[in-house]
UniProtKB/Swiss-Prot annotation:
<keyword id="KW-0007">Acetylation</keyword>
<dbReference type="GO" id="GO:0002040">
    <property type="term" value="P:sprouting angiogenesis"/>
</dbReference>
<dbReference type="GO" id="GO:0005829">
    <property type="term" value="C:cytosol"/>
</dbReference>
<dbReference type="GO" id="GO:1990108">
    <property type="term" value="P:protein linear deubiquitination"/>
</dbReference>
<dbReference type="GO" id="GO:0016055">
    <property type="term" value="P:Wnt signaling pathway"/>
</dbReference>
<feature type="region of interest" description="Linear diubiquitin binding">
    <location>
        <begin position="255"/>
        <end position="259"/>
    </location>
</feature>
<dbReference type="GO" id="GO:0016567">
    <property type="term" value="P:protein ubiquitination"/>
</dbReference>
<keyword id="KW-0391">Immunity</keyword>
<feature type="active site">
    <location>
        <position position="126"/>
    </location>
</feature>
<dbReference type="GO" id="GO:0032088">
    <property type="term" value="P:negative regulation of NF-kappaB transcription factor activity"/>
</dbReference>
<protein>
    <recommendedName>
        <fullName>Ubiquitin thioesterase otulin</fullName>
        <ecNumber>3.4.19.12</ecNumber>
    </recommendedName>
</protein>
<keyword id="KW-0963">Cytoplasm</keyword>
<keyword id="KW-0788">Thiol protease</keyword>
<dbReference type="GO" id="GO:0006508">
    <property type="term" value="P:proteolysis"/>
</dbReference>
<dbReference type="GO" id="GO:0070431">
    <property type="term" value="P:nucleotide-binding oligomerization domain containing 2 signaling pathway"/>
</dbReference>
<dbReference type="InterPro" id="IPR023237">
    <property type="entry name" value="Otulin"/>
</dbReference>
<dbReference type="GO" id="GO:0004843">
    <property type="term" value="F:cysteine-type deubiquitinase activity"/>
</dbReference>
Length: 352
């Protein structure tokens, strides 16, 4: 993939902090993904956009990131998807040593985050990064099996949807999957079963430490890890179909879903699958508007410290804008809206 200037869509007047990324994504899609930065800079510090890279990482950069994560524990041990925790400001000093405007902005952003969290865990930066960071946080914090995973209808979804929407057979199976799409119903059902089983097992553990150890182990098993991502992508598609059908019937839907289907590349769920979800893990990650869909799929509020937006209203972005009060919260750190890391160790004097 070529690497150039990361698109910086126009700001939408009146957008709330959490809605802006979805609006940005829609604006970018309408402009062919090449919209240039046009918002007026704030008088105070903002991270510069002119030298930022494409939304998704080049293959050589992904491989370099993988090698770094292997070296965290040693080449002879299992490959890590989520590195061990380290002091968040030590990590910042290691990653951002220069005195450029962007480095200064990042340091200030990390300093702000360090008021809430003392440590960070680096997440492997491939095109599953957003899914990996979100799912790892959600499962490691599990204190019970969510009602949506207990629903007996869940395992019937693959056959039900694929029989109703023939275009789902265009599904592109993820990495580490054997077999062909003729086995698609069984493959997705196996992934959903694994997600339920692993989530339930983690939720039954008595201590947070035990859950963390088990979750670390799960995310070193690539076959199981990638199967979980397939399940989550299918849940995202299911929610997209529900939202699209509601919109077509004139029902009230979350604003992000209007923007999701306003893109030239995802006018309907079929296009969303072909042009976006099928690319996740292969050639692209999740776009900003799709982070809302991810939140709805796993029914978790996703709070992100967007360090490139330091000193703006978008520094802390919440997906979705107005989440149900009973949704658990996962917190992530993003340096550039494509690579997510995990903050850990909430400061004793701080509460979210």
């Amino acid at each position: 993939m070529s690497r150039g200037t990361m698109p910086q869509p126009e700001a939408w007047p009146g957008a709330s902090c959490a809605e802006t990324p979805a609006r940005e994504a829609a604006a970018t899609a309408r402009d062919g993904g090449k919209a240039a930065a046009s918002g007026q800079p704030r008088p105070e510090m903002q991270c510069p956009a002119e030298h930022e890279e494409d939304m998704y990482r080049a293959a050589d950069e992904i491989e370099k990131e993988k090698e770094l994560l292997i070296h965290e524990r040693g080449a002879s041990e299992p490959r890590l998807s989520v590195a061990p925790e380290m002091d968040i400001m030590d990590y910042c000093k290691k990653e951002w040593r220069g005195n450029t405007q962007k480095a200064t902005c990042m340091k200030m952003g990390y300093e702000e985050v360090s008021q809430k969290f003392t440590s960070i865990r680096r997440v492997r930066g491939d095109n599953y990064c957003a899914l990996r960071a979100t799912l790892f946080q959600a499962m490691s914090q599990a204190v019970g099996l969510p009602p949506w995973l207990q629903d007996p209808e869940l395992m019937l979804l693959p056959e039900k949807l694929i029989s109703k929407y023939n275009w789902i057979k265009q599904w592109k199976l993820g990495l580490k999957f054997d077999g062909k799409n003729e086995d698609l119903v069984d493959k997705i059902k196996e992934s959903l079963t694994l997600l339920r089983k692993k989530w339930a097992g983690l939720a039954e553990m008595r201590t947070a430490e035990a859950r963390q150890i088990a979750c670390d182990e799960l995310f070193t098993n690539e076959a199981e890890e990638y199967s979980l991502y397939e399940a989550v992508k299918f849940l995202m598609l299911n929610r997209a179909i529900e939202l699209y059908n509601d919109k077509e019937k004139g029902k009230e839907v979350p604003f992000f879903s209007v923007l999701l289907f306003a893109r030239d590349t995802s006018n309907d769920p079929g296009q969303l699958l072909r042009n976006h979800l099928n690319q996740v893990g292969h050639t692209g990650g999740l776009e900003q508007v799709e982070m809302f869909l991810l939140a709805y799929a796993v029914r978790h509020t996703i709070q992100v410290y967007r360090l490139s937006k330091y000193n703006t209203e978008e520094f802390i972005t919440v997906y979705p804008t107005d989440p149900p009060k009973d949704w658990p919260v996962v917190t992530l750190i993003a340096e550039d809206d494509r690579h997510y890391n995990i903050p850990v160790r909430v400061c004793e004097e701080t509460s979210l």
